[in-house]
Amino acid sequence: MVYAHNLGFPRIGIKREMKKTVEAYWRGEISQQQLQQQAIELQLTNWKIQAEAGVDLIPVGDFSWYDHVLDMAVRVGAIPSRFKALNSNITDTMFCMARGQAPNGIETSACEMTKWFDTNYHYIVPEFTTNQSFELHHDDLFKSTKLALENNYRAKPVILGPLSFLWLGKCKGESFNKLLLLEKLLPVYAEIFEQLSSLGVEWVQVDEPILVLDLPPEWQQAFLTTYQQLNFFNLKCLLATYFGSLDDNLSLTCQLPVDGLHIDYCRAPDQLDSVLSQLPAEKILSVGIIDGRNIWCNDLNRSLTLLENIQSSLGDRLWVAPSCSLLHVPIDLDQENKLDVELKSWFAFAKQKVAEAAFLTRGLREGRESIGAELKKNEEVIISRKTSKRIHNPNVEKKAASVTERLMRRQHEHSIRKNKQTAQLNLPLFPTTTIGSFPQTSQIRCLRRDYKQGKIDDALYEEKIRQEIAEVIGIQVKLGLDVLVHGEPERNDMVEYFGELLDGIAITSNGWVQSYGSRCVKPPIIFGDVSRERPMTLRWIEYAQSLTTKSVKGMLTGPVTILAWSFVRDDQPRSQTAKQIALALRDEVQDLERSGVRVIQIDEPAFRECLPLRKAAWQDYLEWAVKCFRLASCGVKDETQIHTHMCYSEFNDIIEAIAALDADVITIESSRSEMEILKSFEKFAYPNDIGPGIYDIHSPRIPRVAEIEELAVRALQYIPIERLWINPDCGLKTRNWEETKEALSRMVDAAKHLRKAFSSEKTPTIDLELQPAST
């Protein structure tokens, strides 16, 4: 029989119960028993939603209090020694690995965090050593599976496959071949399968997303040997791939001794014919035809026609599913009561997407007429979106068509600009700054909420925001920071804020998705041509600058990041949408400069995450991404200093594109990786200024002054003294004021020590084992 199934469901809860519960636990307000009870309730709710929609096989093990990769590391005992020594409680150990701090007060340096493939979800990076051991360590998966079975759900446990798990981890200490760990790891996977089999499970979903990447030959070979060795203990294995095409990994994937294969049709429709021709006759094919990463309604008529053609070849060996886990979309469109009715009809969130998969499955089982009403209603929605006048703006399209190369060049090269900027800004050696946001207290969040709900008027809102800006400026001046920010109290999110002010973009009320841990974001929906009617940030920056003689940065989110962290229209190339956003930002940048703002930051933390997963497609993306940044930033005078910020980036393979952005200063996340990221600059002489993140803002742990100095000295191996900035890793929005003030105070003290040590009149007065880079 054709089955409808799902690869994973959002964890956060319809009302973000996960976030509220886990943060209450971190604060010591609830017990671990209460935490686990909430996990049970959230999972039962998720399973019920899917079962009622018509999903046949329900994913189990997709829930996590922080991250599924972290869960897998803990499950197989890949717990770094620094955590084992501090904590015997497995739940607190997990939180300590993620945050550097556990609810019981234990602190140490957190594990590294990075982006999950090309999504905006973050995972905790497993750490492996040459003497790494593994053992079955956590029974959460078995408890969840048993719970699902006891509640009469047909459970399909989901785990990250052994090769993807190793690939996504990093070697700690000396480098070595991670494949050597398979011999110790596979017996633990076998234990997992044995226990699942003993519970009476029929199918297990093993995720191996790295099969859509460019894999070295030894990793390709490792797939064959690994899956030949794995003992599934009579479980049927569905091997799940997603986010791209199998391409050169297709042949080996079809050879693996598994019972079924899931492919991402939405991201890689061209692979379907090759898959059908190579799939062994006995294997199931799960077609991910519902987009798990975007919010547009599926064209059910078109999808059903495609699936009917596949069914004619495969018969009952066809399964229907979303393209990937629905972790990346909001939970329920029914919770949106303020969206425009026509716009809302074009969308589908997780609850609606599993229903779409079930509709299509019923159509395959029982014939088109069985879902005739759904098909007719869906067809009307598809036509509505295609013909709506709100999609296209002739003025925007005309402006985009008139863009020339000249608009994407600064007046002079950076060396000339730097001299002018140095004269104007009068900055010291090792200038200090922050990335943008400052702590957002409950009072600020309530203020914005009351304003949106009409409970307070414009005048009171303006007064309160100005008070907050004045306080933030005063704190920075007192701390001794060199280039200031206004703190962004008016912004709930760095992308959503601009989404609210740009035409062609819709904002939801409850469209939350998980970014990392308990942090959730509400991505805007880009449904049409994007334009700016009026200045978006000008009044707040002008006010902030009026309070101090020090430079205050104008703060904008870049075109690629707005694109990456939004749900984007799928009826035109993403590059075209990015160009429209860049033009809107260019107008804002020029307005800021005209008002006297001397430093403007255009954040692009998503620049690298948007890279296609296959290198063959990189060049095209990098060309339009660089052009869009330059289009947004190059309309200013030499004296205006352009900053950009990037997170979680490995620069080695795109360093030339980073340089091509031609930002005067780039700040980057680097503290969790202990400045390893700066190795990118060993062979490439990056010409502009750099501010490597000098402490980790994602952890509540406050670094010592000596730690900050040590990281700065490491950075000087790669960055000339006169080009090094001192700053945190990222914005400070998620931290509290006590942590923030103390951490920034220590950062400023470290910068002062460095200036004294490296002043031209004196020999360095701190013990430096590392030699600074030359100019």
From Swiss-Prot:
Cofactor: Zn(2+)
Domain of life: Bacteria
Pathway(s) served: Amino-acid biosynthesis; L-methionine biosynthesis via de novo pathway; L-methionine from L-homocysteine (MetE route): step 1/1
EC class name: transferase
Binding residues annotated for L-homocysteine, in chain numbering: I435, G436, S437, E488, D603
GO process annotations (BP): methionine biosynthetic process; methylation
Gene3D superfamilies per the UniProt record, alphabetical: 3.20.20.210
Binding positions for L-methionine per the UniProt entry: I435, G436, S437, E488, D603
UniProt EC number: 2.1.1.14
Cofactor note: Binds 1 zinc ion per subunit.
Protein name: 5-methyltetrahydropteroyltriglutamate--homocysteine methyltransferase
Gene that encodes it: metE
